[in-house]
Amino acid sequence: MRLVFAGTPEVAVPSLDALLASEHEVVAVVTRPDAAAGRGRRLVASPVARRAAEAGIEVLKPARADDPAFLDRLRELAPDCCPVVAYGALLRQEALDIPRYGWVNLHFSLLPAWRGAAPVQHAILHGDDITGATTFQIERELDAGPVYGTVTEPIGPRDTSGDLLERLAKSGAELLVRTIDGIAKNELVPRPQGSEGVSYAPKLTPDDARVDFTAPALRVDRLIRACTPAPGAWTRFRGTRIKLGPVEPLPDAAPLPPGQLVATSRDVLVGTATHPVRLGEVQPQGKKAMPAADWARGARIGDGERFGDD
């Protein structure tokens, strides 16, 4: 089949590569416009745009998905199907109607659970043991179209959202190719999503990523892992923001008041509402990430100092 692939971030690149290696023809990609990045705020093409350029494929970067020039070019390309992975913009009905077999989205949850922009983060945040990826036909309602297929993935006790997304990007790419193969051979009929088990996963903001050490250790651990690498968990120390990497809950350790820091030559412990957690890496404002023990030696943490104090 003739395909136009839509995607933007790094997590979409394995799917593009898998489709390029398949028997189908990727005639173009659609991605978000170049965005400012780095300290110099220089415009940088998306990972999908860069990969497509390497492969010699036409790249479309509409500012709006209903841009008339974009829609005209999409019609000229005459795709049979448009696979989508984390494109990052809502598609209008006029665009949805162009390909003969519609737009097929790869979503990183087991729908109807965790519809929305941050399914992996919410799966970790809420303590799910299993997640996965789903291919489905895009319709106007968010992530609610009929399902072609799924693949499951266990969530490990130390998984971050970055770890989990990396695995799902690979297994999801294989699922997407199998789905496109099945559609091309008229072997797949999508099934409607059920009305039970629907949940939503809105994008996590920096405010959502602030760690509350008056919460139980389990919740602190899940929040930090869910927000790693993005948007990045953080707290405040001596009036400045400090980012926190994943922690290790210590259920057998002596309790500490929430947020209170205790540093040894090897470890830094922080109190929560239940038991302490051991810090891994921290990143003080304006500095690079470093082991928590190195940070504590440089900061010369005093008795009774705590995270969260402004």
Curated annotation (Swiss-Prot):
Record region (Disordered): 283-310
Catalytic activity: L-methionyl-tRNA(fMet) + (6R)-10-formyltetrahydrofolate = N-formyl-L-methionyl-tRNA(fMet) + (6S)-5,6,7,8-tetrahydrofolate + H(+)
EC code(s) of this entry: 2.1.2.9
GO terms of molecular function: methionyl-tRNA formyltransferase activity
Record-linked CDD domains: FMT_core_Met-tRNA-FMT_N, Met_tRNA_FMT_C
Entry-linked InterPro entries: Fmt, Formyl_trans_C, Formyl_transf_N, Formyl_transf_N_sf, Formyl_transferase-like_C_sf, Met-tRNA-FMT_C, Met-tRNA-FMT_N
UniProt xrefs under SUPFAM superfamilies: FMT C-terminal domain-like, Formyltransferase
Record-linked Gene3D superfamilies: 3.40.50.12230
Record's keyword terms, sorted: Protein biosynthesis, Transferase
Binding positions for (6S)-5,6,7,8-tetrahydrofolate per the UniProt entry: S109, L110, L111, P112
Basic and acidic residues composition-biased segments: 300-310
GO cellular component terms attached to this protein's record: cytosol
Pfam name, any one: Formyl_trans_C
Primary role: Attaches a formyl group to the free amino group of methionyl-tRNA(fMet). The formyl group appears to play a dual role in the initiator identity of N-formylmethionyl-tRNA by promoting its recognition by IF2 and preventing the misappropriation of this tRNA by the elongation apparatus.
Family: Belongs to the Fmt family.
Protein name stated in the entry: Methionyl-tRNA formyltransferase
Species this chain originates from: Thermobifida fusca (strain YX)
